[in-house]
Amino acid sequence: MITRFAPSPTGYLHVGNVRTALICWLYVRKQKGKFLLRFDDTDTQRSQEEYIKEIENDLKWLNMNWDASFRQSSRFDRYEDVFQYLLKEGFLYPCYESKEELEFKRKMKLKSGLPPIYDRSALNLTQAEKDKYFGRAPYFRFKINQDQLINWDDEIRGKVSFNPKNISDPIIRRVDGTYTYMLPSVIDDMDFNVTHVIRGEDHISNTAVQIQMLDALKAKVPMFAHLSLLYSDDNKISKRVGGSSVKDMQLYELEPMAINSYFAKIGTSHPIDVHINMLGLINSFDITAFSQAPTKFNIDDILKLNPKILHNMSFDDVKDRLKELKIDKPAFWDFVCGNIEKFSDIEEWIKICSRDMVPVVKQDDKDFITLALNMFPQGEVHDSTWNTWVSNIKQQTDRRGKNLFAPLRLALTGLAAGPELAKLLPLIGREEIVRRLSYSVTQ
């Protein structure tokens, strides 16, 4: 099995791209197949090297690797060879209308209540009419066979039957000699033996045309799966919608696996479970579970998954990131992971565990904190120190529950809520504990 993800490097990856890439990746990895990364950069005016690098970096950040990659701009000679073959065999034909003439035809069709389908007038030009266009470079269309329905078994939509009379003969090559999406995509799928194509439902008419192109080239037709489109606030998600790029999600400080856990299940009947690695998503993936209904995207739903991902990560999962913060103690991660919503929240806990932390004590609690300081156990501070300390305090005071724990937490962390204090004490050590308690009662 071979599938491909084919972004255009004319901008950053957005959520629609991410979902398509992820589903392609999970699908082929579950079948032990190959994942190709193809850059559709035939639009040389808008394609940029910067975006190619950013797309590669974003996929790596999202834990999606690829087995091979290539750029369509490196294959223009191959496209030209196939173009000449199709032209010779009568599958392509030249057209001479200007953009203004085509737009006029489109408006007249709509005004007459007809679908704006190309009238194939270029097919019926006499030699005399062609001579009038002498000196004007043609563009080329693929001649669709309108005599039979185009059928395929879609892995999401089931049996699909498409009437070719409902679409225009697609433009294959522009006046300037550059290629549109259609033909290069077909040639690449043929040459790289792509067996499965997964993409959005907005490509269904493209699929119908490309099946005929593959037939014209006597090539094997791959399996197709067309995903429903993503919507947000009743608007189709696109590159132009603010807040929808991978870069935007990184600014939200979303974890890659929160994003992946969400997009692997959104649009299915399955619950969205958090997975801290890709293997769990691979094992639970089922392409037939995806619905044909439009799929609502809400970044707030990913935000809710983010803390769950962090809470379930082990020290080994984050040790490289912690190392950048000069933290090498698994006990620290065990202490904070259940109380952060985004990874950068760790910085607050680093401060709390350092000598920079300023204790807080209420006036009414000063005597109690003095007592607690005197009751603190002797010897090395370890995991059981907290329970021993609290037991000692209870023997000397009638404080219980919140009245006992809240003043200690404020004095030791400056916060009204947070992780277990039993885990904090070994991290800050006896000297710092005594300093904080002493500071609290002397201010």
From Swiss-Prot:
Motif ('HIGH' region): 7-17
Listed GO CC annotations: cytoplasm
Residue numbers binding ATP: 239
Superkingdom of source: Bacteria
GO terms for biological process, alphabetical: glutamyl-tRNA aminoacylation
EC class name: ligase
Keywords for this protein: Aminoacyl-tRNA synthetase, ATP-binding, Cytoplasm, Ligase, Nucleotide-binding, Protein biosynthesis
Enzyme nomenclature, EC number: 6.1.1.17
Pfam families: Anticodon_2 (PF19269), tRNA-synt_1c (PF00749)
Transmembrane segments: none
UniProt-listed InterPro entries: aa-tRNA-synth_I_cd-bd (IPR045462), aa-tRNA-synth_I_codon-bd_sub2 (IPR020751), aa-tRNA-synth_I_CS (IPR001412), aa_tRNA-synth_I_cd-bd_sf (IPR008925), Glu-tRNA-ligase_bac/mito (IPR004527), Glu/Gln-tRNA-synth (IPR000924), Glu/Gln-tRNA-synth_Ib_cat-dom (IPR020058), GluQ/Sye (IPR049940)
Coiled-coil spans in chain: none
Catalytic function, reaction form: tRNA(Glu) + L-glutamate + ATP = L-glutamyl-tRNA(Glu) + AMP + diphosphate
Chain span(s) of sequence motif 'KMSKS' region: 236-240
Gene Ontology MF term list: ATP binding; glutamate-tRNA ligase activity; tRNA binding
Similarity annotation: Belongs to the class-I aminoacyl-tRNA synthetase family. Glutamate--tRNA ligase type 1 subfamily.
PANTHER family (UniProt xref): GLUTAMATE--TRNA LIGASE, GLUTAMATE--TRNA LIGASE, MITOCHONDRIAL-RELATED
Subunit structure: Monomer.
Function: Catalyzes the attachment of glutamate to tRNA(Glu) in a two-step reaction: glutamate is first activated by ATP to form Glu-AMP and then transferred to the acceptor end of tRNA(Glu).
Matching NCBIfam families: gltX_bact
Protein name: Glutamate--tRNA ligase 2
Protein source organism: Ehrlichia canis (strain Jake)
Gene designation per UniProt: gltX2
